[in-house]
């Protein structure tokens, strides 16, 4: 597995604190010496990477190399077998499944997610999120009737309701 980043990606490591002074490095993520175990099998040993706010990083590698396990671990859904993960911004995660309720409309899914996470609770903000992902034309249909691509767009719209400084982890 490899992480593709700009050459300057390691110049500004992340800090644990959510409160930073004006001279602090940009917000970000630091993974240091992390070992990943999945199904009792070591899939990564001593993995390290750093990212700063605004970067886009692609994880690539063969099936079973630990890409999804790493994302789930950074998101706090799986424990690391060793090492440390520091992130000074909120983490928002979409896994293989989009986490949408199939019986609800896309709009209802966004409203419920916002309410459960203590975020915006107004139609204008939800419409703006749907517009950002070009999902408003099908937002009032039950999710079970949407194509896979339409579901992903609704799931991505959900993330845009979160904090603008959040780290997005998108798995496939």
How would you describe each model-predicted region?
Residues 58, 151-160:
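ABC ATPase nucleotide-binding domain "signature" region
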Residues 123-138:
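Conserved ABC ATPase "signature" region
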Residues 75:
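Helix-to-loop junction immediately C-terminal to a conserved catalytic motif
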């Amino acid at each position: 597995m490899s992480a593709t980043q700009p050459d300057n990606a390691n110049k500004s490591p992340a800090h644990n604190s959510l409160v930073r002074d004006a001279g602090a490095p940009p917000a970000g993520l630091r993974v240091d010496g992390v070992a990943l175990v999945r199904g009792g099998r070591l899939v990564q040993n001593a993995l390290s990477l750093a990212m700063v706010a605004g970067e886009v990083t692609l994880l690539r590698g063969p099936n079973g190399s630990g890409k999804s396990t790493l994302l789930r671990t950074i998101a706090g859904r799986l424990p690391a077998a060793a090492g440390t993960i520091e992130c000074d911004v909120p983490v928002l995660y979409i896994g293989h499944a989009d986490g949408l309720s199939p019986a609800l409309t896309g709009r209802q899914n966004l409203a419920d997610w916002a309410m459960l996470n203590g975020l915006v609770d107004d139609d204008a903000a939800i419409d703006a999120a749907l517009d950002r992902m070009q999902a408003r034309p099908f937002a009032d249909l039950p999710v079970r009737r949407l194509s896979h691509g339409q579901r992903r767009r609704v799931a991505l719209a959900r993330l845009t309701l979160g904090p603008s400084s959040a780290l997005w982890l998108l798995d496939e």
